[in-house]
């Protein structure tokens, strides 16, 4: 009986170890967000990333320093938003959904990064109206004319190594 138990253990043990290995979560690279202070929508986007498993650090920058950061990370000027982030070897510009970032890290395309240009309402961090934030954020958002929340369709753009863009995800 003891021999039978040992034989079964030897057969099952490698499989149980493999199952345990597969169940272990993969560590995500940390996200560093560079944002002007105060930007409540940027803070909400950071919370969205945290809720999806990312470790996030926010570095408050002067508005005047943001263009230098965007140039350093090779963000095309036509795709700029308020905040800029770095995850692994990629930049994230604007309110990029966490599921797009996760897919980027899984697929590992040869690219500079992802961008959601402007400030589309309904994007992560832009789900609700905040009059305090809109004072700064509406520069790119129709001057804050609409107080009611409206969800806007938006695309996440993949920026290739040469700066060319393609639609990575539609929301």
Residue positions per predicted region:
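N-terminal, post-signal-peptide region of Sec/Tat-exported proteins
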Residues: 41-89
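Loop/turn elements at helix/coil->beta-strand transitions in domains of secreted/extracellular proteins
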Residues: 28-30, 54-55, 80, 110-112
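Ser/Thr- (and often Asn-) enriched beta-sheet segments in non-cytosolic proteins
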Residues: 32, 55-57, 155
